[in-house]
């Protein structure tokens, strides 16, 4: 992944947070929120097998959290608490609740994905109420330029809770959590525009290996690994936002989808860890809401 240049761009920002006595009046803020990352999965928290040198560098010159606890074990409610500062006793979002009466079991339906792909009104989760105060709106009032890049999950397209309406001047990424289960989507959202990714094809996350495919043959998984890896596209937008606001106070909220399932990474990076950790003998061939994966441990490490 294209982390080297991104980390280099962010290090000056991170360095500011580590020197409280030298902080400017309005220091830039970069908040990283990883998705389903284990506490010990980064080098700065003691991990020895998975290599995370660039994140470790950010941690060394910034702030790491050792006593920050999530308010919920699910994506949307935990994000709601972070965005609003409310614990789950008062939070508006308390579950991964779909819109239009869709039930969890329905999420395995290809027709559901096709419908949300064709009509954005069927995309996304239960929205925050219009006018909700968030860290984005608070920072805007303080004179900051704000961006959220990554996964949103707190209100679908055409609702009152699109990121641009919740305090973020710029948004790029996944509006809907279910579509974020693929790292090779054929579209992402840029503000309120659905942007199709040339070279990637429509592939619902309930897709499976072709009938008769050999689950131990890496080529059987080719259809799930397309041209553009969504994280790389997000890194480019992050760098652009940082560059364009170099002279302005900004807050960047990077809600990366890594390393949430489906565990996917570019093949060369996965094979690096296959060689390092050893061949795996148990592929995931029926991942429920996620794609099949030949080397789940190595793919997780590569992410």
Provide a role label for each language-model segment.
Residues 151:
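Active-site glycine-centered loops adjacent to acidic/histidine catalytic or metal-binding residues
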């Amino acid at each position: 992944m294209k982390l080297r240049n991104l980390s280099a761009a962010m290090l000056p920002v991170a360095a500011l947070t580590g020197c409280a006595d030298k902080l400017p009046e309005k220091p830039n803020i970069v908040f990283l929120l990883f998705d389903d990352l284990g506490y010990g999965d980064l080098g700065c928290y003691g991990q020895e097998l998975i290599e995370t040198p660039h994140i470790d560098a950010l941690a060394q010159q910034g702030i790491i959290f050792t006593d920050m606890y999530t308010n919920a074990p699910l994506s949307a409610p935990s994000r709601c608490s972070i965005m609003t500062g409310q614990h789950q006793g008062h939070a508006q979002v308390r579950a991964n609740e779909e819109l239009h009466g869709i039930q969890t079991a329905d999420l395995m339906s290809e027709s559901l994905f096709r419908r949300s792909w064709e009509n954005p009104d069927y995309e996304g989760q239960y929205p925050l109420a219009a006018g909700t105060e968030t860290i984005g709106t608070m920072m805007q009032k303080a004179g900051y330029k704000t961006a959220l890049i990554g996964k949103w999950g707190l209100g679908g397209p055409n609702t009152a809770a699109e990121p641009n309406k919740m305090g973020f001047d710029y948004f790029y990424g996944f509006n809907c959590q279910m579509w974020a289960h693929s790292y090779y989507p054929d579209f992402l959202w840029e503000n309120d525009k659905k942007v199709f990714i040339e070279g990637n094809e429509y592939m619902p996350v309930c897709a499976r290996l072709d009938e008769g495919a050999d689950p131990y043959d890496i080529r059987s998984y080719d259809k799930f690994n397309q041209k553009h890896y969504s994280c790389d596209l997000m890194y480019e937008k992050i760098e652009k936002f940082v560059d364009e606001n170099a002279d302005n106070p900004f807050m960047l909220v990077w809600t990366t989808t890594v390393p949430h399932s489906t565990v996917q990474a570019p093949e060369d990076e996965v094979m690096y860890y296959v060689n390092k950790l050893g061949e795996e003998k148990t592929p995931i061939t029926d991942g429920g809401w996620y794609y099949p994966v030949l080397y789940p441990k190595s793919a997780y490490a590569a992410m």
